[in-house]
């Protein structure tokens, strides 16, 4: 994930936005695709040089020794495939090609799993690590084929070019990606440390268990957001049309996630037995709190994609900082009182308040002249 963000300069949501916005303007679309290609090529090449030239310190930092310099240099090449694969997927999302995007991911993952197995058999532990990077990188193969077959854009559009205005707009998404990679991950690290200090690492494991199940099904549910919601909102310019789309999305998303969450709650004992072990049975008491938070978190995602679609860096930073602050405030209040249960309660309380704030800000924006 980190490689994908850094190699592609974090611009993929921006690519989807501007492709959707200019899908019926060939001249502007060519500028978007060409500038995106140049940025991806530049950042991925820079990453490759850093990995090749600094292989020894990177190996030391990641593995505690310098024995993996060869692996680091191979990953320097593989990350270029990750970047280009993500760029091609972002282009398809801009055209709302859900089928092409899904097929590319499925076929690419199957090829990647085979490559992982071969790498593991040939290289053991180092081969397995390389194989993990190959899985997302090899998506580039079916993505290229799918883009050619769909014919949405000529491959000549991918020739790197440069437009200062577009590069500046896309750079906003680089900042967004960097902010996202810092705020919530740091908040969760701090929550884990607080929980371990107040109680034990066993409590951390209980909370992490329910969080991992939550993340798994939420990824499945929100996968369609970047394929449908982001390009759709990017194409809309009238406040009335945007409002209608947001309300329609909320009317679909909230009941769907509530139904999925209720199903997970009903099957919580089976999920613990299937995915974890009897040591995690205490986790069952956390599900209700976590799942309520999940429903409202996904509801807030709808507003988040509106912010991304309009490339509003100011509101994006405000949203990320708000989530971080709310998590920290509720965590320091509830974790000392209730342990792992308090962590789940802090998560739920955060997204009750955050979703309410999103609704309030949206209503104010809608009523502005």
Q: What role is predicted for each listed range?
A:
Residues 59-61, 182-217, 270-276:
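Helix-terminus/linker motif at the lipid-water interface of multi-pass membrane proteins
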Residues 8-24, 94, 210, 214-238, ...:
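Helix-loop junctions and terminal segments of transmembrane helices
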Residues 8-56, 70-71, 239-261:
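Membrane-water interface segments that mark the loop-to-transmembrane alpha-helix transition
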Residues 80-104, 292-319:
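Membrane-interface junctions at transmembrane-helix termini in multi-pass inner-membrane proteins
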Residues 55-75, 201, 247, 266-295, ...:
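Interfacial segments at transmembrane-helix termini and the short loops linking adjacent helices
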Residues 69, 73, 102-151, 321-326, ...:
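Hydrophobic alpha-helical transmembrane segments
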Residues 1-8, 38, 176, 191-194, ...:
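Alpha-helical transmembrane segments of polytopic membrane transporters and translocases
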Residues 128, 132, 143-186, 236-244, ...:
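Interhelical loop/hinge segments that connect adjacent transmembrane helices in multipass membrane
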């Amino acid at each position: 994930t980190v490689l994908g963000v850094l190699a592609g300069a974090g611009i993929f949501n921006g690519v989807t936005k501007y492709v959707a916005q200019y899908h019926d303007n060939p001249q502007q679309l060519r500028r978007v695709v060409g500038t995106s290609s140049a940025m991806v090529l530049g950042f991925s090449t820079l990453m490759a040089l850093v990995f090749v030239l600094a292989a020894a310190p990177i190996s030391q930092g990641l593995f505690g020794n310098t024995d993996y310099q060869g692996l680091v240099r191979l990953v320097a090449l593989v990350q270029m495939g990750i970047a280009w694969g993500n760029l091609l997927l972002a282009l398809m999302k801009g055209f709302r090609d859900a089928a092409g995007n899904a097929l590319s991911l499925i076929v690419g993952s199957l090829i990647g799993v085979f490559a992982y197995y071969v790498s593991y058999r040939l290289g053991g532990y180092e081969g397995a690590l390389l194989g993990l990077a190959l899985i997302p990188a090899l998506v580039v193969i079916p993505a290229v084929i799918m883009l050619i077959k769909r014919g949405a854009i000529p491959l000549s559009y991918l020739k790197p070019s440069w437009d200062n205005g577009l590069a500046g707009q896309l750079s906003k998404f680089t900042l967004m990606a960097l902010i996202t990679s810092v705020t919530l991950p740091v908040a969760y690290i701090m929550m884990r440390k607080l929980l371990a200090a107040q109680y034990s690492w066993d409590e951390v494991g209980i909370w992490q268990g329910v969080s991992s199940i939550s993340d798994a099904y939420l990824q499945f549910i929100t996968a369609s957001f970047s394929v449908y919601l982001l390009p759709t909102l990017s194409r809309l310019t009238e406040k009335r049309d945007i409002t209608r789309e947001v309300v329609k999305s909320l009317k679909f998303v909230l009941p769907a996630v509530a139904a999925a969450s209720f199903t997970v709650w009903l099957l919580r004992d089976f999920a613990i037995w299937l995915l974890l072990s009897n040591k995690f049975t205490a986790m069952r008491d956390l599900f209700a709190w976590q799942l309520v938070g999940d429903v409202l978190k996904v509801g807030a995602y709808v507003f988040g994609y509106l912010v991304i679609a309009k490339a509003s860096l100011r509101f994006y930073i405000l949203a990320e900082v708000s989530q971080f602050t709310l998590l920290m405030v509720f965590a320091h209040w509830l974790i000392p009182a209730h342990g792992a249960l308090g962590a789940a309660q802090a998560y739920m309380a955060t997204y009750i308040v955050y979703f309410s704030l999103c609704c309030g800000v949206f209503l104010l924006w809608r009523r502005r002249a």
